[in-house]
């Protein structure tokens, strides 16, 4: 029975899912914008938004917790030095998910996941 199980399975086992979302978060924090399938994008929000909330208070313990989830030093540095202070006044809703059409090979629905008020938007 499915009682009290949250989150989508996405046809992956738990370790694959955990690694996939960690990699997606690293890419999102590094590039501030990624393209993925719509179900993955909606599920990624459950993991990425609490990480940005975690980065608002830059303590050593929170950095270690973020590193244990991301396993990427550069992503943790950018998260705590750039993104955390940037979103200090915002109480949540750090990500924007925009539908992006369908993938050519299998017609899967695509979505753009980007940080709201991202810093590199002015450069584009």
From Swiss-Prot:
GO BP of this protein: translation
Keyword Phosphoprotein found: no
Pfam families: Ribosomal_L17
Keywords: Ribonucleoprotein, Ribosomal protein
Entry keyword annotation includes Nucleotide-binding: no
Entry's Gene Ontology cellular component terms: cytosolic large ribosomal subunit
PROSITE patterns xrefs: RIBOSOMAL_L17
Superkingdom field: Bacteria
Subunit structure: Part of the 50S ribosomal subunit. Contacts protein L32.
HAMAP family noted in UniProt: Ribosomal_bL17
Annotated PANTHER family: LARGE RIBOSOMAL SUBUNIT PROTEIN BL17M, RIBOSOMAL PROTEIN L17
Family that this chain belongs to: Belongs to the bacterial ribosomal protein bL17 family.
Protein name: Large ribosomal subunit protein bL17
């Amino acid at each position: 029975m499915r009682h009290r199980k949250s989150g989508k399975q996405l046809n992956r086992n738990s370790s694959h899912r955990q690694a996939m979302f960690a990699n997606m978060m690293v890419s999102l924090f590094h590039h501030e914008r990624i393209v993925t399938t719509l179900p993955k994008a909606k599920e990624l929000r459950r993991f990425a938004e609490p990480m940005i909330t975690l980065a608002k208070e830059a303590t050593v313990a929170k950095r270690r917790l973020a590193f244990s989830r991301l396993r990427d030093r550069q992503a943790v540095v950018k998260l705590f030095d750039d993104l955390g202070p940037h979103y200090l006044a915002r109480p949540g809703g750090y990500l924007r998910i925009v539908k992006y059409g369908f993938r050519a090979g299998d017609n899967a629905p695509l979505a753009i996941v980007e940080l709201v008020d991202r810093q590199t938007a002015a450069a584009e």
